[in-house]
């Protein structure tokens, strides 16, 4: 037993490899014959009719005055341009028919490439992507059948998770400490609370202070010392000097 398991989808179609058709590809005799046949048929059956039709339409537009003619060469430049456009349009319109002829060739690498490309385009979207994804996943999973590394992994002991300790006395994992919820600070509770003063108390206090100030103004015994001391009479000479008698 080689340790590999081969899983394959039953009745799976293996897509044929697309032949490489590069610039250095040399066509076969049948392919050359089909090339010449396509060239002749596209010229006589498509290019010539379209070129003639384009020239007739262009000449009619010029004669009706819809298209202006050249002052020196007349309608010749526009007719040549219409002929060239009709020629290439005929060649391009015959490409599909020429491809069908190559697909009918049995021993033709070019025909095989065209058939493979058509099969890929006609398949449902994601078909080849899903198949390649399935193959890659199967090949990646098939290596675990008899791998010794897988056996060693299974023999390793399984450790149960350590329960988290809810107290400081029990053993706890390294680096993990219990979170102790602290209560409110007692100093904050002991701080005196500010007494709320009502409006009535504040009003009475202001009234008392007003009455005290009013009595001080009316009572002469409470007047200031400098108001109660009588002023001495002094004499003043003509020079403004004063003296006491």
UniProtKB/Swiss-Prot annotation:
The keyword Phosphoprotein applies. Keywords: Endosome, Phosphoprotein. Residues 111-141, 169-245 are annotated as: Disordered. GO terms for cellular component: endosome; Golgi apparatus; lysosome; membrane; mitochondrion. It is found in: Endosome. GO terms for biological process: endocytosis; hematopoietic stem cell homeostasis; positive regulation of receptor signaling pathway via JAK-STAT; regulation of stem cell differentiation. Pfam families: OCIA. The keyword Phosphoprotein applies. Isoform 1 is highly expressed in many tissues, including testis, brain, placenta, ovary, prostate and mammary gland. Isoform 2 expression is restricted to the central nervous system including brain, cerebellum and spinal cord. It comes from the Eukaryota. Residues 1-112 form the OCIA domain. Residues 190-210, 224-238 have a biased composition (Basic and acidic residues). The modification Phosphoserine is found at residues 108, 116, 123, 191. Maintains stem cell potency. Increases STAT3 phosphorylation and controls ERK phosphorylation. May act as a scaffold, increasing STAT3 recruitment onto endosomes. Involved in integrin-mediated cancer cell adhesion and colony formation in ovarian cancer. The OCIA domain is necessary and sufficient for endosomal localization. Interacts with OCIAD2. Interacts with STAT3. Belongs to the OCIAD1 family. 'Asrij' stands for 'blood' in Sanskrit as this protein is strongly expressed in blood vessels. This is OCIA domain-containing protein 1. It comes from Homo sapiens (Human). The lineage of its organism: Eukaryota, Metazoa, Chordata, Craniata, Vertebrata.
